[in-house]
Amino acid sequence: AKNKSPEMNIICCVDDAPEKVGRSIMGIEIMGTTEDIPELVERCEIETILFAIPTVDDENKRRILSICNKTKCNVRILPDIVQLIANGGKDVLSRVRDVRVEDVLGREQIELTDLTNTLVSGKVVMVTGGGGSIGSELCRQIAACGPKRLIIVDIYENSAYSVQQELKRRYGSALKLDVCIASVRDSKKVDRLFARYQPDVVFHAAAHKHVPLMEDAPEEAVKNNVFGTYNVALSADKYGVGRFVLISTDKAVNPTNVMGATKRLCEMIVQALAQKSKTKFVAVRFGNVLGSNGSVLPLFKEQIAAGGPVTVTHPDIVRYFMTIPEAVRLVLEAGAMGNGGDIFVLDMGNPVKILDLAENLIKLSGFIPYRDIEIKFTGLRPGEKLYEELLMDEEGLRQTDNKKIFVGAPLKLNKDTFFDHLATLKQIAYSNNSDNLVQALIDLVPTFHHAENNYD
């Protein structure tokens, strides 16, 4: 298409069915297949490419977008026909969107069942860390399911306020919403919140998650992640919560950094409590989330906007990715099906090279990698792996009714010994002795191999 304000002038079409080449659609000729896009762009002086097959499979979407990226055209994506019909065919151009990194990654959406509605509909639901990237999306999706009451707990008032205002605008008085500014480290405050609201379901998303920062402040990671989880989980057990869902991470598997080790301890806490509690404690473990606070995508966008360079730690580093809504669908679905002590993991497809992600984002921003925007390799940070794992060998794996969700068998823990060691860890953490603390983590988490100076 050529851009002619306020509308576009459609010049030609392409279709991957060779037999359609030469035909016309409403007077617009089909002049080739997708492989012909670069040549047609040059010959017809095309400025914008409209991607009008949003239901195409992931592999072909990536292939076609890769061809489009070889041109200097602005690439836009049309909504699917269902969206257009739902809108009465009005304002079509306003619904055309830019290509997003998610389109290039091609993540297949998780299909939810009625379990999710059963979990939260008509229930009192508490979300800790409810102002964060995952927590706020949890609140959005829970609110859409019609809870009896939604309680957002967060220490950061600005993010909590933002979610509160968004949900008020969307639901008004139809949603009973309470926002509580509180730290999960404060066991007495946590206890009072549970006594007051008597939640049926708790999603525990509050945590420190930045690997390099937690390497420099391991005592803060332990206080917030480990004992924040301990406080919330104990209150859930005390007040008879039906389900407790811990938001975990693939960095908890064979951890090489403090943050991952603390998240593994969080999993061990809920697995230990599950042995004696009527509350169904489960954990949901997933990889990196696109666009979350502090994740690589916003960082790359900032670096591109500043003219570069885009910093990648290692040319071979790979990560599993999913979108925030996808991650939350997993949490809700798995939380609904879990039994006590289960750890759920997502079939996350193929890992993505961070270098490929950086190059694609530069292209999507209208620049050419290494020419317009430089990519700089900075070296692995302390505790950082080239690749992440999703499951420890001893956990085993079986598929659930959802083909994208798997569950690992609960590990057997001597809960009395475990909680004794946890008490020792707490004493060390609050003495702010970082050296002894890391060793205490190693003693508690047998799979923790601390890579203190891992720059290779």
Task: Tell me what each language-model feature is.
Residues A1-N74, I155-S162, R169, L177-D178, ...:
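A solvent-exposed beta-alpha-beta segment
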Residues T34, K61-V124, D237:
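Flexible, Lys/Arg-rich cytosolic regulatory linkers and terminal tails that connect or flank
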Residues V41, E45-E47, P147-K148, F194, ...:
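Proline-aspartate-enriched helix->loop->beta-strand connector
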Residues R62-L78, R149-Y156, R196, V201, ...:
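NAD(P)-cofactor binding segment of oxidoreductase domains
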Residues A86-N87, H204, H208-E267, A272-A274:
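Conserved Rossmann-fold NAD(P)-dependent oxidoreductase catalytic core, especially the SDR/UDP-sugar
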Residues L115-L119, M268-V289, N293-D456:
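Strand-loop microenvironment adjacent to phosphate/nucleotide-handling motifs in alpha/beta enzyme folds
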Residues V125-A143:
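N-terminal Rossmann NAD(P)H-binding glycine-rich loop of SDR-like oxidoreductase domains
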Residues I181-V201, G383:
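Conserved Rossmann-fold cofactor-binding substructure of NAD(P)-dependent oxidoreductases
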